[in-house]
Amino acid sequence: MLFCATLSVAQTNYYTTSKTFYENGYTYRCDLCASRFLDLYNVNNKWIGQFPSYKSTGETFVMPDAGIQLTTHASWLENKEKVKNIVNAAFTAAQKQTIANQDITLTMYINTDTGKIDDVCFTFLNNEPYAYIPVSVYRNIELAIKENVQEVLTDEGRKLNFIYWWTSVVPK
């Protein structure tokens, strides 16, 4: 007779409700929608819930259908790769295996005076594997992006108070 035993490790879904995480030196907020999508972000973020506007008039910026280039294409391509590498490096091999080809969406808020990233917001479903990743991992991603990513802005981009930049990444 052959006996087979499996080890089952309990996992914690950290993001089952809207709540605030008081961590070691930082605070994160999880806002959960009825759709089960959630936004996870540092409470010190200044642009969450705001819309980009023109510095000179305060008028809300709306991207036209034809598009307007707000950053240079070269810097966007370079920084997209940097963000992908930062996200890839943040997760352990076991976490990547659990995530298994599912993407995570990052919304970054670009400072139009410096080109640096001011704020980062993570969006995912609260029943996806990302919901089992502790806040500290997302904090490390936020800090690495803020330290290593800087966009080259166009003249049009510099007219705004900030620029949205979102991307989806599948950790490999």
For each predicted feature, which ranges?
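Charge-biased low-complexity segments
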Residues: 11-172
